[in-house]
Amino acid sequence: MAKGLFHLTHGIIPACDVLTLREFERILEETSSVECVVAYKIGSVLALRFSLPEICRIAKKHTDLPLIYDHQKAGTDIPAIAEKFAESCEKSGISAAIIFPLAGPSTEIAFIDALLRHKITPIVGCVMTHARFLTSEGGFIASHAPYEVFEKAIERGVQHFVLPANKSFEPLAAFISKRCINPSFIFVGIGSQGGSLAHAFSSVGRHNAYAIIGREIYEKDIRLAAREFCTQALKFK
């Protein structure tokens, strides 16, 4: 049994990055009773089309599990937006929010602090799963930036971190583990993007580990796919 945001130390988080309410409800109906589903990730597409409060209302007809909002990518605006963002999440019924604070330390601090004030668990990431993101990959974002982002997040009390399972995440996981007393790692990029749940979970040892999984669940037999991923996750319980 885990303490805090999730009720288990290892589990999966279905990503509800779909276009219709029927698709969304089907994910909930098919997975809410699967043993190690620990939360649901709600993306910006559903929120924009139907409103975040409405999405949360529908979700809560099917589940009591935490709802994680992924604004794709929150934390890239000016610091003044943070309070409005956090208040909107709280009033909608969100439990946690993912931010990628690429706009600098002032924005990162503002978003983390605002979320905590509104009793929303901040989940911080900095490396996306696609190619040519960091400068070392031919992208725009400095390769040392994730270390600075995560260090600042830990200083502000963050304990939940997003890492890309389909990239070389191990140095970042080790960096976080040395500085955060009880980190929870949330992996993305598993399945068609090349990441392995088993490798990701085993790489962080005794620490809590979770996998956000979207298309590999909702584009297949939803219940069966969720159960298969849960079988993998429960091996690390």
Where in the sequence are the language-model features?
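Conserved anion-binding
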Residues: 9, 76-169, 181-185
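Conserved N-terminal beta1-alpha1 strand-loop-helix module at the mouth
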Residues: 1-68, 76, 152, 219, ...
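Non-catalytic positions within long, well-ordered alpha-helices that form the structural scaffold/packing
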Residues: 32-33, 89-90, 154, 201-204
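Alpha-helix-loop-beta-strand connector modules within alpha/beta enzyme cores
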Residues: 48, 52-71, 113-127, 174-192
